[in-house]
Structures are given as C-alpha cells and as structure tokens.
Swiss-Prot record:
Xref: InterPro entries: Znf_SWIM (IPR007527)
GO process terms (BP): double-strand break repair via homologous recombination
Location relative to the cell: Nucleus
Keywords (A to Z) from UniProt: DNA damage, DNA recombination, DNA repair, Metal-binding, Nucleus, Zinc, Zinc-finger
GO cellular component, one term: Shu complex
Protein name: Zinc finger SWIM domain-containing protein 7 homolog
Superkingdom assignment: Eukaryota
SWIM-type zinc-finger residues: 82-120
Keyword Ribosomal protein: no
UniProt similarity note: Belongs to the SWS1 family.
Gene Ontology terms for molecular function: zinc ion binding
Organism: Dictyostelium discoideum (Social amoeba)
Protein task: May be involved in the homologous recombination repair (HRR) pathway of double-stranded DNA breaks arising during DNA replication or induced by DNA-damaging agents.
Keyword Nucleus: yes
Length: 156
C-alpha cells in the first residue's frame, strides 16, 4: 500500500525542520555541493538569492533579554529591513505577502531561508536588547520594511 503525503497544507512542513534534516550531519558550518543541490531541489532559484544575503552578511538576529525572544532582521535594497519570525512563518517583505500568502507560488521567501541558514552555519550577527525594547524595535524594523521605490503615475 502506497503512502500518501498531504501537501495541501503548506504549514505541515516547516522550514526549520527541512533545514535541520539537511544539515543534521554537517559539523563544518559550511554548505557542501550535495547540500546545495538538496537546497536547490527544494527552494529552486530562491536559494541563490538567500545565499547571497548570507555572503553579504545582511542577516542580524535581535535577541531580547531576559525572555530570550528573538527575530531576524534582513537588510534589503535601498535601506529596507525585513523582520523574519522563523517559528511564526512570517516575513515583513513584499515578496512574502505576494508570492507566499496571496499567490502561493512559494512556501518561503529568501529572507526566511537566509535567516535560518545563517543561523545553522553560524554566520549571523547577534544584537542583544532589553525586553523593554521589543515593541520599539519591531516598530522600527516594520517602518523600514516599506522603503520601496516610489512610482510616479502619469495622468492622461
């Protein structure tokens, strides 16, 4: 009897679980060719954009003490910053909203993938804050999530 996997609910497979399995035996904090092929098979072209963010060291983990709450901040183009909640399956980038939530073209955006990959290979900057700064940091990052080029529309 064949086993059927339910793929209708994308939340059944979590990004963190996928990457932990792929890197389970990786003790070198590097990405081997075999691992890269596995990542490409799962995430397609998005993996290359994610790796570029890691190479440019654009991922920072904000950790709040004493609660140990955290989220990732990924720097984007033109001063934009995006907040990623890996456990909460959220990113404040436009691609997450459009491609992941609305169109369902992707399961994860490049910022989510790069955040957890950077953590796994120990290539993430960490900044610690007091818990009292949690809300203000979120508001600060969210305000920078919408720094997109303005478009001027011509009236006819």
């Amino acid at each position: 009897m064949a086993t059927t996997i339910n793929t209708s609910n994308k939340n059944t497979v979590k990004l963190l679980d996928i990457l932990k399995i792929i890197f389970e035996n990786n003790k070198t904090n590097t990405i081997s060719e075999e691992t890269l092929l596995s990542l490409y098979y799962i995430f397609d072209q998005t993996i290359f954009a994610s790796l570029e963010l890691i190479d440019k060291e654009l991922i920072t983990k904000y950790v709040f003490q004493p609660s140990n709450r955290y989220f990732y901040v990924v720097e984007g183009r033109k001063g934009a910053k995006y907040m990623c909640l890996i456990q909460g399956d959220y990113c404040s980038c436009p691609s997450f909203n459009f491609s992941v939530l609305l169109k369902s073209d992707s399961v994860y955006c490049k910022h989510q993938i790069s955040s957890i990959l950077a953590e796994i290979i120990s290539n993430v900057k960490v900044i610690e804050f007091d818990d009292s700064e949690y809300q203000s940091q979120i508001l600060s990052i969210e305000s920078l999530s919408f720094k997109t080029p303005t478009h001027k529309f011509q009236q006819k």
